[in-house]
Amino acid sequence: MKFAVIGHPIKHSLSPLMHHANFNALQTDDEYAALHIDPKHFHHLRDIIHEKAIDGFNITIPYKVDMLQVVDVVDIKAQMIGAINTVHIEDGIWYGYNTDGAGFKASIEKYTGGKNIVILGAGGASRAICYTLFKDNKVTVLNRNTNRVADWPFQIDAYTYEESDGVIQQADIVINTTPVGMEGFMPDTLIDISQLKSSAVVCDIIYTPDKTPILQSAAQRGLSVINGLDMFVNQGALSYEIWTGKKANKAAMKQAVINYLQRSTLC
């Protein structure tokens, strides 16, 4: 079978590396390519995918929201999240899914359930994670403004960072979904880590660098920290299961990404 990831830009994507590690571990002859789709050609996407005989694909920036208007059938989770990151094609019908929220939830499963969770940011990743966690936990969003959260089709409490003191003190889990801390962005922790209780867990959906400023500060306080690597692997594994009905080899996928990142650090 043939799979791909589409985006603009796309050359930075580690998805082909990760998925080919899975194919090798499972001894399949599946293929996975990174396809750059220029915005001016996006309206030809169905023709492009058909021409390349692709069976399923992932979507990254900037097309996750736009895909809602392209697919034939949208999964209920993708509808609520308002974005699609996985498309499965069967008998010419395009089915749209979102595995981001479930991918993240799987990475922190042992910590969740009846917890006070504070999510930093109100973008697409935040919405996916909020939707996946809010039914079993008390979820609060902190963002520069709260307007975006008010438009979501499910109810979440939201505050600005200036209003965050009491919220942070009660947090069991803090999750950064913003690009702050990613390479090329201003180093910042967004919140006062010293206000967190000693049992708090701090997460970041970023996996390069492996410890963003917020994770570094939390680790220095002795708090448990989790970066975004497991989320990346889990969402990819879930995509593979949607496409094929088979379980992915997540250990092989994760190790391939770790090896690549370690080599990159040494260069």
Curated annotation (Swiss-Prot):
Q: What is its EC number?
A: 1.1.1.25
InterPro entries (UniProt xref):
Aminoacid_DH-like_N_sf (IPR046346), NAD(P)-bd_dom_sf (IPR036291), SDH_C (IPR041121), Shikimate_DH (IPR011342), Shikimate_DH-bd_N (IPR013708), Shikimate_DH_fam (IPR022893), Shikm_DH/Glu-tRNA_Rdtase (IPR006151)
Question: Is NADP given among the entry's keywords?
Answer: yes
Which superkingdom is the protein from?
Answer: Bacteria
Q: What are the UniProt keywords, alphabetically?
A: Amino-acid biosynthesis, Aromatic amino acid biosynthesis, NADP, Oxidoreductase
Catalyses which reaction?
A: shikimate + NADP(+) = 3-dehydroshikimate + NADPH + H(+)
Any single Gene Ontology cellular-component annotation: cytosol
- The record's active-site residues are 64
The positions annotated for binding NADP(+) are: 121-125, 205, 228
Record-annotated disulphide pairs: none
Pathway as given in its UniProt record: Metabolic intermediate biosynthesis; chorismate biosynthesis; chorismate from D-erythrose 4-phosphate and phosphoenolpyruvate: step 4/7
Q: Name one GO biological process term.
A: aromatic amino acid family biosynthetic process
Could you tell me one molecular function GO term of this UniProt entry? shikimate 3-dehydrogenase (NADP+) activity
Sequence positions that bind shikimate: 13-15, 60, 85, 100, 207
- Is Nucleotidyltransferase included in the keywords of this UniProt record? no
Q: Which HAMAP family match?
A: Shikimate_DH_AroE (MF_00222)
Report the protein's function. Involved in the biosynthesis of the chorismate, which leads to the biosynthesis of aromatic amino acids. Catalyzes the reversible NADPH linked reduction of 3-dehydroshikimate (DHSA) to yield shikimate (SA).
Q: How does it assemble?
A: Homodimer.
UniProt family annotation: Belongs to the shikimate dehydrogenase family.
Name by which UniProt lists this protein: Shikimate dehydrogenase (NADP(+))
Classification from the root reads: Bacteria, Bacillati, Bacillota, Bacilli, Bacillales
**Gene encoding this polypeptide?**
aroE
